[in-house]
Every structure is written in C-alpha cells, then in structure tokens.
Amino acid sequence: GGIIVDGELFLGGNMNAGEYSGMFTEDEMSRRPALQFLIEDLAANGIVLSGIHKLSEQYRDDWPGVAEWVEKVAPQYNRLVNALWSTIDPQAIVFGGEMPKPLAHRLIGTTEFRMMRTARYGIERLFPKLIVSDLGGAAPVLGAASLPFKDMMF
C-alpha cells in the first residue's frame, strides 16, 4: 500500500509506511487480503494461475473460490480499513495495483465502518470514499517514474 498526505507520498520514519501486513497476527497472515492467497484458493478449486499478473489478466468474478475468499478475508480487510480510517482519517482509500476491478468492488461491498459517525462529541465523522483505481498494475511504476520529475519541477 501507499499513503499520500497533502499530495505527497508519505514514507514514514523507516521508509516502510503502507506495509499493512504487519498488523496481522501469524495466524491471520493467510487470511489477509493478499492476492497470493486467492491464487492458492483458486488452485484448490481447479483454476491454476502462474502468478498475480495472470490473475489480473484472466480474472472472472464467477470462478469457484472467489466468493469464499472474499468472505474469508473480510474481517482482516475491515480491520485494515478501520485502522486507516481511525489513524489517518483519509478522504479516500484507493484500491489498485494488480487487484482486478470486479474483485476490488466485491471487497468494498464487505466494508463495515465500525465506529459511529457521531462517536466524538456529537460531531459527524465522515467516511472515506472507497475508490477503485483505473491504473491497474501500472500504478507503482507510474508513481515511481514521476518522482524525479516532481523533484525537478516542483
């Protein structure tokens, strides 16, 4: 993942901001929303893919195992979304990378914001927008490629 604050990439004190896997226990690691585990579950259902790039290219929302995987990872996904909402208070959370768009929409459909909007002093708390990126797997490359230009021009 990545964190953008005021239009700038936030790297954190040790350059690892956005490494969300660290928030899960050892027992939860295989149930976190990581595409490598969906690929394993699909293989157990007879759909063998050689990697995440093939998942992105060939994805079908009706494959056996997809709905079960989404249900399995939903608790960890929701913890992640709620942790981001509670600690960073983002205006938006963007789903991108190699995740197929229909799968991103499925995950978004499981979102449960656990804290009430009026949790503090009667002030309405806004939910972040949940957005599916159009950049696909090119997002990290495009972002990295833009950094030298940003440093030169801005």
Regions found by a protein language model. Give the residues of each.
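Phosphate-binding/catalytic loop of phosphoryl-transfer enzymes
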Residues: G1-E28, G143-M152
